[in-house]
Amino acid sequence: MHLKKYLLKGLHRLQKGPGYTYKELLVWYCDNTNTHGPKRIICEGPKKKAMWFVLTLLFTSLVCWQWGLFIKTYLNWEVSVSLSIGFKTMDFPAVTICNASPFQYSKVQHLLKDLDALMEAVLGRILGPELSQVNATTALNLSIWHHTPLVFINEQNPHHPVVLDLFEDNFNGSASSSPAPGRPCSARRCKVAMRLCSHNGTTCTFRNFSSATQAVTEWYTLQATNIFAQVPNQELVAMGYPAERLILACLFGAEPCNYRNFTPIFHPDYGNCYIFNWGMTEKALPSANPGTEFGLKLILDMGQEDYVPFLTSTAGARLMLHEQRSYPFIKEEGIYAMAGMETSIGVLVDKLQRKGEPYSQCTKNGSDVPIQNLYSSYNTTYSIQACIRSCFQEHMIRECGCGHYLYPLPDKRKYCNNQEFPDWAHCYSALRISMAQRETCIYACKESCKLLGTSPPLPPCLLPPVSPQDWIFHVLSQERDQSSNITLSRKGIVKLNIYFQEFNYRTIEESAANNIVWLLSNLGGQFGFWMGGSVLCLIEFGEIIIDFVWITIIKLVALAKSVRGPPPTVAELVEAHTNFGFQPDSAMPGPDAGAYRREQNPPIPGTPPPNYDSLRLQPLDVIESDSEGDAI
């Protein structure tokens, strides 16, 4: 009951309004505010009123302008960067090592036999008929060649370039690999390009190269990708270099280690790779001292004699230092350690800590990125490299109908190959150079808020070439092959030293350049300096604004009521106060009814009764209390 009464009073108060006009509110505000200036407008003479009005308006505008600048600066979400450097006990970084050759040629030769024979014929044609050693009667598998051939482009006439196939009689369907003698074009006078066709050869494009070496390498890699994409992953792993053959010796600090301390992982570009101190199943190993004696020492055998001849142009190891539980994108971020060299890597860990939203578009774990992370099956942390490659594979599947061999596959999808997807090479080439695809993926992917990097390695040193040092290779040969003879070639050995430098960490951390405290301090400083105001002055101004809005709403409601219908007439008001349901009491029948005179009813008033409450000089509750006192 009390709540209903309270709410009813509140409703009546809202309907009544402040009880002032606009002018009265302004005069009240100027007379009572603590802000300097407004009070002088109503207390001075006409000239001073005008002067103080102009000054107050000027300084108010100046304060608003300064406030706008500070708010704009704050909303730019600028950051300041702090740099700290030193040495402390840290987890030793994960080290991924791979052989530059992804497979052992002795195990993949049966898969690449036709491709290698065709490659030799191509090289013979490019080198020229006089240098070609290709047997003219050798039969080749020209299905590979017809699908994606290499061509000469003669641009002696730029307006009418001539496209010439490397094998002239291949146009007639002949299986002969003999180059046409006396062809008017060679690699010295013409450009070598790759012809990519789709829709049964009706739509073709040419991918040009500045060097015949690049053209042949790209062509061979594309054909090898088609072959390996059709081989099960278990067979590919068996064709790579096993850990016990690759890793000859291992030492971490004062503790010996071996290939069992490395986690195997298959990389499409480099075959079997091995990760030391990955931290997936075991705790990461720390390092508390700088120098080579407290780092990781490795001796690797590259097995250079078993390299795939046309697939690999570098002899050595590919390695990468990265954070624990992160996927090694070794092709993009790795470095080479050349065979026959000793390479030392002094590690300086760079840690970058970015501010999140709204200061930057970084992500903490990739959950807010709209791209499916295809590398999540490795149980690794998010990285922008993983996102960009997942995005490319997504576009590849959508545009070409199949996935590329170099990237993980989503469920229920297949890798591209010439048999099932004959147009995939043309589609892949177009997608690879598409700027729209790149911009889409770069826009969708976000950088990680935490990044870790390492410093570049020191220049490599040659391994000892003199004969007194052959005992090293004798011992290594005995340990690996149980042979008293040297079975390891000095040219195929890689020695690595990975250790912390004297300063092993460098932290780059972002912090907010302008926080909310900075903003409020500057806003209050400007308001106090130019107008002598404070937060309470702003509350007073807010109060007057609320009253203005209140009065305006009441006026609008009254205007709406007057528009909907005319005001009630006097007759309607009288009718409203007339009680037509009133009937006089009839006399009760009785023996002495005639003895009494019939009581006359008073006439019904034709005007509404007066509002007697308005005639009282005191409130109703005061009168009632006085009457109660008299009664007592």
UniProtKB/Swiss-Prot annotation:
* Biased composition, class Pro residues, residue ranges: 602-611
Task: Give the residue spans that cross the bilayer.
Answer: 51-71, 534-554
- Subunit composition and interactions: Component of the heterotrimeric epithelial sodium channel (ENaC) composed of an alpha/SCNN1A, a beta/SCNN1B and a gamma/SCNN1G subunit. An additional delta/SCNN1D subunit can replace the alpha/SCNN1A subunit to form an alternative channel with specific properties. Interacts with WWP1 (via WW domains). Interacts with WWP2 (via WW domains); inhibits the channel. Interacts with the full-length immature form of PCSK9 (pro-PCSK9). Interacts (N-glycosylated) with BPIFA1; the interaction is direct and inhibits the proteolytic processing of SCNN1A and SCNN1G and the activation of ENaC.
Among the GO biological process terms of this entry, one is:
multicellular organismal-level water homeostasis
Segments for region (Disordered): 589-615
**A Pfam family:** ASC
Question: Where in this protein would one find the motif PY motif, according to its record?
Answer: 608-612
Per the UniProt entry, the disulfide pairs are C98-C273, C185-C190, C197-C204, C250-C257, C362-C449, C387-C445, C391-C441, C400-C427, C402-C416
Q: Could you identify this protein by its name?
A: Epithelial sodium channel subunit beta
Which sequence ranges are listed under topological domain Cytoplasmic? 1-50, 555-632
